[in-house]
UniProtKB/Swiss-Prot annotation:
GO terms for cellular component: core mediator complex; mediator complex. Component of the Mediator complex, a coactivator involved in the regulated transcription of nearly all RNA polymerase II-dependent genes. Mediator functions as a bridge to convey information from gene-specific regulatory proteins to the basal RNA polymerase II transcription machinery. Mediator is recruited to promoters by direct interactions with regulatory proteins and serves as a scaffold for the assembly of a functional preinitiation complex with RNA polymerase II and the general transcription factors. The gene is MED14. GO terms for molecular function: transcription coregulator activity. Residues 565-580 have a biased composition (Low complexity). A motif (LXXLL motif 2) lies at residues 739-743. This is Mediator of RNA polymerase II transcription subunit 14. It is found in: Nucleus. Residues 561-582, 1009-1173, 1510-1578 are annotated as: Disordered. InterPro entries: Med14_C, Med14_N, Med14_RM2, Med14_RM6, Med14_RM8, Mediator_Med14, RM3_Med14, RM5_Med14. GO terms for biological process: regulation of transcription by RNA polymerase II. Transmembrane segments: none annotated.
Length: 1578
């Protein structure tokens, strides 16, 4: 060990005496702890002072405070001195260590001297050296070993050599022989006969008690047995928790005890057995006793009791203590005794039962004790099971006395007695009788009916008075049968009731019905109740017989029941759930009207049931009838199902509707054949011999109208009669012809499998058909018509009969049309077979195909609710049937004339013009009105009669189209009144230039040729001559009749040649201030609620035809409700039925006219009487065209109402007007529109321009002598706007420099270059006056014209780049000038409004820039497009991006904003130069987006490339929520025929831009020439 220096205190410290070291340690304290003590003492004293001072006087407080401060000051001064001293304590420590070292050295010297002195005086005095062992040393040194150790060491340490395996085997075998000899020669107990000798020992095993091993230590006869091992086999597997019952110490004690006894015992083996047997029996009794106590504590409580326990001798347990207390037969009770045999202690434990049980059962119980599982619970369970079998056996014997021929069975554990009460009986319907294992009482239940109310009483009888069992079993049998009835009827339309409030007289036969009955209420028949009487068979009580009674009832009130019960009986237990109020009294009772008893055999063996079949073994049995009765072929039913009841209920439910139907038919005097069963018993059928002729429907008079009429007429007058609805007249020959074709009428009932409901099916079989159709199912001579109806309750059977008669009227009225039409279509003179094809005639509807290729259909049928004929138009390849818009007018015409031939001619002649008109787009548009969010229909078609309709354009202009014969139609301006052409209807505005526009499409050659051909082929007939002073007749004055063109005060148009009425007019039109009719005729007045703001309209509003017609849009969008802004058809009640009325007869249908009052529907103008024969009527309606009384000139008249004069056009010209085509000037881009829409749109834009000129202060209107030309002046420019004189389909502008005086400062006015003025003109032509026509575009353009010349000059430069993109060859971006706010722009101004705003020397405008493709294979549709709101500040001459501060600026927009700010900071402009166009030009040339890919030449110079630009188009990422692709550079936009493409309703984020509007639309943009059409332009 390396020595340590003394300064470190290593060695010296160990020599400090223990007491001194501890003393030094006790005198030391850490400085930190001392400071803590001082602070705690000070805080304590301060706390005590604060608590005590308030109780002292002022002087005492001062004294205490001074004493505290003085003591505390002194204490902390000491602490301060101590701390200062501790700063130099290192020197003191070093001195102390030196002194301690010196003290330890002196002590060391002193101790050494004392120890040496003690050794010299005490230890070394008696010290001696030992004698050396010379021999051992010599031996070790010479030989290297030592052999003289004592032998005891070897004996104690070195073990002897073990014996070999052979010696061991021989020894054990010899020992086995010795043991075997001793056992043979000795006295061995019978209980020890089970032993095994091996390995020199004998092992005795007594089952379930012990196992012991013994051996002998020699072969002498007197050598005692040696006890080797004891194993106690008694176990407690229930309460022992798997532990041994005997402790090891106990086993060792028994081992020593037995070993001591067998040493001196003559019979050692008997002594071993006796000791161990007694111990094991005592242990078994103790285990059983312990288990019994635990059973009592845990589960069985007081149900068992330990009566006596003698350890090692006896255990007595009693059970069924409740039965012992109640049963007088068991005074001693039920006990179980387990005891040892006192006479022979070698025997096992014995079990005694009180009362005693059979020997076999006793042996089984004894095995429970001697088994491996020693269990008192098991012993009790077995004993209770044996006792239960005995009790149930006794009960079975008693039940057999009154329940004979019943199959009893005792089974299960615990034991159960199964007693069937019915035959057949489900196992779950047996009475399960068992013994309560705890109490010994009998328990019973029916598993299927656990809630049976009879069970408690039956259980009480089983345990007490068994004389009531027979009665209770009978009641249970009835109760279960009632439940079977409920189960049987759960899927049938019937409910069971135990009681019903029936009211009947005292002597009524219903009282004879037994007490056990079931009331069955039919769900579908409230007036019928089925009573089922239940009886037991006398020969076999377990079988039931059923008797059925049908009871007719009616609801009865309390007063009715009292009147009945005054002399009778009321069997009511509870009020019925179905209570009705009549005369203020609730009807809670059911009065019995009649009672019918069913013959059960007849009811269950009628039609639809199986025939009894006899299984006969021999012919002799068949002849003599001997032997048992033949068995019916067994149909397997569940035991709970009562087939007789189900059959009777189903039969009643099936036949009662037929009975009620037959009764109602008899009441209506409709002959029928009664209820019959069809062949093969398939179903019931009710055949009607004939059906009555339909009666005209009557409109009942309302109570209020009747009261008002009675008040006006007085008490003596008759009440008003109900009004009869007009229906077709049924001639006798038509009726007879229909009845001849009607072969049979059958009524059947069926089940609708899909919805599981019953329904009526009425089959009408006709012979052939009057009209041969092309339908493949209508070719045979047997024509069946099937009518289906939901089966209503029996009390509503009259409604069902009414429905049959209504559908019969449907067939009859349609047959009246078909019967007349049959003769007309066969006549080749009328050429109807070439006009129309009969696709189907099913007696209920008629389907006709017409049109050029017979591709459109009309379905005609009689509507039983509306009491009129209905027409449904279908078909068409590209659009729906164009006649859908005229459906109401055509229906009214058909319901007035009842002539199919006229309808066919109307459909044939009007199909082509209506198909052309249907091509006009009826899509709603936004931003037309002052409120940009209100949609307005582009075209709204308003039918007024079968041959007259109005077409409204954007709710401003109106055209009136009249369809004429011979391929002609007339068009006039519908804004003018029909009476006074100088008067304008307030709803519309006259269309300026309409006459000139229409005259460009007049084909005079075709018009006159068709007139001459019509006159040559069909000369005027005296029958069809018109009154020269009359007006056009409804349809008769349109294209099928010749009419004269009247003057302005009586516009008379030729039309269909139908019969005209011959009565004078009775009033005038309240719409117009001037009317050609006298006001006083008949004293007629206008309707008080008539809307004076609307044009002439019928007094019944009718739905707009646009509701079902969208022919021009492939997308077929739903029409807008703005169709109501357009006027409806015109007609008044006095217009109909007069030849001299200037009105055309219009449809009596309803109108959607806003504010139109509801007035009586006018009747259409009648034609010839329907009594006339078809030949005369067709002569009247044959196609003729009479030459007009004046010629239509193409020269525009000088009158302002020139458009009010009709212009005749051919159908081809009308189709040209309405068909969408490209612009006549191909250099003007735009979508495909119809010429009519272009003309009206141009007129509309011109009118908007005129309105804006009058509103704006800076625009000065100039009077023009040319009609249709708008002149105005702005700043120093003069503008002229006019329609194209060639085609009148586009607006054009001419700009010229106006002569201006010098300015205030003497400078000449700015002279505009001709190139700038030309750009301005081209921009107006292609971007402003272009579709879609929006007022906001004109407003933006005119506001731009008001701006200063230097600003407008820059705007013109932007327009130049917009119109001619090729000028910016080096630009990275193309630009478009936006004039209308798109929905994808920043929400600065409302969508659809103007985009140029000037306020406080700041100008807001919008441009759209599109990235020029710069990568290989990059197309315009993949380019980025941004819509930028720009702000030009005229005060500071800065151009910036308009941004909203609260919004998060997109990355692309922020890049543009940063670029513009950089331009403002770095660019130096010329004096007086506007920064607007330079900023835009710099943006187009130098803007680079942060995520833009570099061109291919710069890819190598870039360290990392950014991600590719996301594709534009709808939904793509972009600055405004979507990227907008521009139009191709310098390319011609190929427009789309889809009218949806230019609808602002389709505008959305990501819409694309056309190259003629600068505005983002919602349609697809033409990415390349030939692509889809433009989006939403200006």
């Amino acid at each position: 060990m390396t020595p340590q220096p003394l300064e470190q205190g290593g060695a010296v410290a160990s020599f400090i005496p223990t007491g001194q070291e501890m003393a030094q340690r006790q005198n030391l304290i850490p400085l930190g702890r001392l400071i803590d003590f001082i602070i705690q003492r000070t805080y304590h004293e301060l706390t005590v002072l604060a608590e005590l001072l308030p109780r002292k006087t002022d002087m005492e407080r001062k004294i205490e405070i001074y004493n505290f401060s003085a003591s505390t000051r002194q204490l902390f001064i000491r602490l301060l001195a101590l701390v200062k001293w501790a700063n130099s304590a290192s020197k003191v420590d070093k001195s102390a260590k030196i002194m301690a070292f010196l003290d330890k050295q002196s002590l060391l010297f002193m101790d050494t001297a004392d120890m040496l002195s003690r050794m010299a005086r005490e230890t070394l005095v008696n010290a001696r050296l030992p004698n050396f062992h010379i021999p051992a040393a010599v031996e070790i040194l010479t030989t290297g070993t030592y052999s003289r150790l004592p032998s005891i060491i070897r004996e104690r340490i070195v073990p002897p050599d073990p014996i070999t395996t052979l010696e061991k085997r021989q020894t054990l075998q010899r020992l086995n022989q010795v043991i075997q000899h001793r056992l043979v020669t000795g006295n061995l107990l019978p209980q020890l006969r089970k032993f095994k000798i091996e390995n020199g020992r004998v092992t005795f095993k007594v089952d379930h008690e012990f196992e012991v091993s013994l051996t002998v230590m020699g072969d002498g006869p007197n050598i005692p047995w040696r006890l080797l091992d004891i194993d106690i086999l008694v176990e407690d597997k229930e309460t022992g928790d798997g532990k041994a019952l005997v402790h090891t110490l106990q086993v060792n004690y028994i081992h020593q005890l037995i070993q001591g006894r067998i040493v001196d015992s003559p019979d050692a083996l008997a002594e071993v057995y006796n000791c161990l047997h007694y111990f094991c029996q005592s242990l078994q009794l103790e285990v059983l006793y312990t288990q019994t106590l635990r059973l009592m504590r845990d589960r069985l409580d007081d149900h068992i009791h330990v009566d006596e326990y003698i350890p090692g001798t006896k255990l007595t347990v009693s059970y069924w203590r409740e039965l012992t207390n109640k049963d007088p037969k068991s005074e001693l009770g039920y006990r179980l005794m387990i005891q040892t045999d006192q006479s022979d202690t070698t025997k096992q434990l014995a079990i005694l039962h009180l009362p005693s049980i059979g020997t076999k059962e006793v042996d089984i119980a004894d095995r429970a004790v001697r088994s491996e599982l020693l269990s008192m619970e098991r012993l009790l369970v077995h004993t209770v099971y044996v006792r239960s079998l005995a009790r149930l056996g006794d009960l079975k014997t008693e039940l057999q006395l009154f329940l004979k021929d019943v199959d009893y069975s005792i089974q299960g554990t615990p034991a159960m007695l199964l007693v069937p009460v019915l035959n057949p009986c489900l196992r779950a319907e047996h009475i399960y009788i068992t013994v309560d294992t705890h109490t010994g009482m009998l328990r019973c239940h029916v598993p299927k009916h656990l809630d049976c109310p009879i069970m408690p009483e039956l259980q009480h009888a089983l345990n007490n008075d068994r004389s009531k069992l027979q009665h209770l079993f009978s009641e249970l049998r009835y109760w279960i049968t009632q439940r079977r009835c409920e189960k049987t009827l759960q899927h049938l339309p019937a409910t069971t009731q135990e009681r019903l409030p029936l009211v009947f007289p005292a002597d009524h036969p219903i009282e004879k019905i037994g007490p056990h009955r079931v009331y069955i209420q039919m769900c579908r028949h409230a007036n019928v109740i089925l009573i089922v009487e239940l009886k037991e068979k006398e020969s076999s009580p377990n079988e039931m017989t059923y008797t059925f009674y049908l009871v007719l009832v009616k609801p009865s009130s309390m007063e009715d029941s009292q009147s009945v019960t005054a002399g009778g009986t009321s069997q009511s237990s509870a009020p019925s759930a179905a209570t009705t109020e009549s005369d203020g009294m609730p009807k809670m009772y059911l009065k019995v009207l009649s009672l019918i008893e069913f013959d059960t055999f007849v009811a269950t063996h009628g039609p639809g049931t199986y025939v009894d079949e006899q299984t006969v073994g021999s012919k002799r049995k068949l002849l003599t009838g001997e032997g048992p009765s033949a068995k019916q072929s067994k149909t397997i039913y569940p035991a709970y199902f009562i087939p007789e009841l189900a059959h009777v209920v189903a039969m009643c439910d099936e036949k009662l509707p037929f009975v009620a139907l037959a009764k109602d038919l008899t009441r209506r005097k409709i002959p029928h054949g009664g209820v019959q069963v069809e062949a093969n018993a398939t179903s019931l059928v009710l055949k009607l011999l004939t059906l009555p002729q339909p009666k005209p429907p009557v409109i009942p008079v309302s109570s209020s109208a009747a009261a008002a009429a009675a008040a006006q007429s007085g008490p003596d007058q008759k009440p008003p009669e109900p009004k009869v609805v007009s229906v077709p007249k049924i001639d006798k020959d038509v009726w007879n012809a229909l009845l001849k074709r009607l072969l049979s009428v059958s009524v059947r009932a069926q089940i609708n499998k899909s919805i599981q409901t019953r329904m009526w099916t009425v089959e009408l079989v006709f012979y052939g058909t009057p009209l041969a159709s092309a339908h493949h199912k209508e070719q045979g001579m047997r024509r069946a018509v099937y009518l289906t109806y939901d089966m209503l309750p029996v009390d509503s059977v009259d409604k069902f009969v009414d429905m049959i008669l209504n559908d019969w009227s449907k067939i009859v009225y349609l047959y009246t049309l078909v019967h007349d039409f049959r003769e007309q279509i066969k006549n080749d003179k009328y050429n109807l077979h070439n006009i129309v094809t009969i696709k189907s005639y099913s007696y209920t509807s008629l389907l006709l195909a017409y049109g050029p290729n017979k591709e459109v259909n009309v379905n005609i049928y009689w509507d039983t609710e509306a009491k009129e004929f209905k027409m449904v138009f279908t078909g068409g390849n590209n659009a729906i049937n164009a006649h859908s818009m005229m459906r109401d007018q055509l229906q009214a015409h058909l319901n007035h004339n009842y002539d199919l031939a006229q309808i066919v001619y109307l459909l044939h002649e009007t199909y082509q013009p209506l198909s052309s008109i249907a091509k006009l787009p009826i899509i709603p548009h936004l931003a037309i009105l002052q409120s940009p969010k209100i949609p307005v229909l582009s075209f709204c078609i308003i039918p007024q009669s079968p041959t007259l309709l109005r077409i409204s354009f954007q709710g401003v202009y109106c055209l009136e189209v009249r369809l004429r014969g011979s391929g002609l139609c007339s068009i006039r301006d519908g804004a003018y009144s029909r009476f006074d052409r100088s008067h304008v209807v307030e709803e519309f505005t006259p269309t300026q230039g309409l006459k000139g526009f229409l005259s460009k499409y007049v084909d005079e050659t075709a018009v006159y040729r068709r007139r001459s051909q019509s006159e040559d082929d069909n000369p005027p007939s005296p029958i069809t001559m018109e009154d020269p002073h009359g007006g056009p007749a409804s349809v008769g004055s349109t294209f099928l009749s010749g009419g004269a063109m009247r003057g302005p005060q009586s516009p008379r148009d030729p039309g269909l040649r139908f019969a005209a009425p011959l009565t004078p007019p009775s009033g005038s039109n309240p719409h117009t201030p001037a009317s050609p009719h006298p006001q006083g005729i008949g004293g007629s007045q206008s309707h008080p609620n008539f809307n004076m703001t609307s044009p002439p309209a019928p007094h019944m509003p009718h739905p707009s035809p646009s509701g079902g017609l969208m022919p021009s849009s492939p997308l077929n969008p739903q029409p807008s409700p703005m169709a109501a802004h357009s006027p409806g058809p015109t007609n008044l009640p006095y217009m109909s039925g007069h030849t001299d009325s200037p009105f055309s007869a219009h449809s009596p249908a309803a109108s959607n006219w806003p504010g139109s009052p509801g007035m009586p529907r006018p009747s259409p103008r009648p034609g010839q009487s329907p009594d006339h024969k078809a030949q005369k009527r067709l002569l009247i309606i044959s196609l003729k065209f009479t030459a007009p009384h004046h010629n239509t000139s193409r020269v525009l008249p000088a009158r302002s109402w020139a458009g009010a004069i009709p212009t005749l056009l051919t159908h081809e010209a009308l189709d040209t007007l309405c068909r969408a085509t490209i612009h006549p000037q191909k250099e003007i881009p735009g979508p495909e529109l119809s010429p009519l829409e272009r003309f009206l749109g141009s007129v509309f834009m011109r009118r908007q321009l005129q309105r804006i000129i009058h509103q704006e202060d800076n625009l000065t209107a100039i009077t023009s002598n040319e009609p249709g030309v708008v002149l105005f002046k702005a700043d120093n420019l003069q503008y002229q706007v006019f329609l194209n004189p060639n085609h009148m389909q586009s607006l054009h502008m001419k700009v010229s420099q106006a002569p201006m005086a010098p300015t205030m400062d003497g400078k000449p006015p700015y002279q505009w270059p001709p190139e700038d003025l030309q750009i301005l003109e081209q921009f107006f032509d292609q971007r402003v006056a272009a579709p879609p026509y929006r007022p906001a575009v004109v407003t933006s353009f005119t506001r731009m014209l008001n701006l200063p010349s230097q600003v407008m000059k820059d705007f013109i430069q932007i327009m130049r780049l917009d119109l001619i993109p090729e000028l910016g060859q080096g630009n990275k971006w193309n630009v478009q000038f936006i004039l209308r706010m798109p929905p994808s722009a920043t929400p600065i101004v409302p969508v659809g409004t103007t985009t140029i705003l000037s306020h406080r020397q700041k100008i807001l405008f919008f441009i759209q820039i599109t990235r020029v493709p710069y990568l290989p294979n990059m197309e315009l549709k993949d380019s980025v497009t941004m819509l930028l709101p720009m702000v030009y500040d005229m005060t500071v001459n800065h151009t910036q991006l308009a941004e909203r501060r609260e919004q998060i600026i997109p990355q692309l927009t922020s890049a543009v904003s940063a670029h513009l700010r950089r331009f403002v900071e770095c660019t130096v402009l010329q004096p007086g130069e506007c920064s607007l166009f330079p900023a835009v030009r710099d943006l187009l040339m130098n803007l680079t987006l942060p995520n833009e890919q570099p061109p291919p030449g710069q890819m190598g110079n870039q360290i990392g490339t950014m991600g590719g630009m996301a594709p534009g188009g709808p939904g793509g990422p972009g600055p405004m929520g979507g990227q907008i692709a521009p139009s191709p550079v310098g390319g011609q936009v190929v427009s789309s025929p889809n009218p949806m493409m230019h609808s602002p309703m389709q505008m959305g984020g990501g819409g694309q831009q056309s190259n003629y509007g600068g505005m983002v639309g919602g349609g697809a943009q033409s990415g390349v020439p030939g692509g889809p059409g433009a989006g939403g332009p200006n």
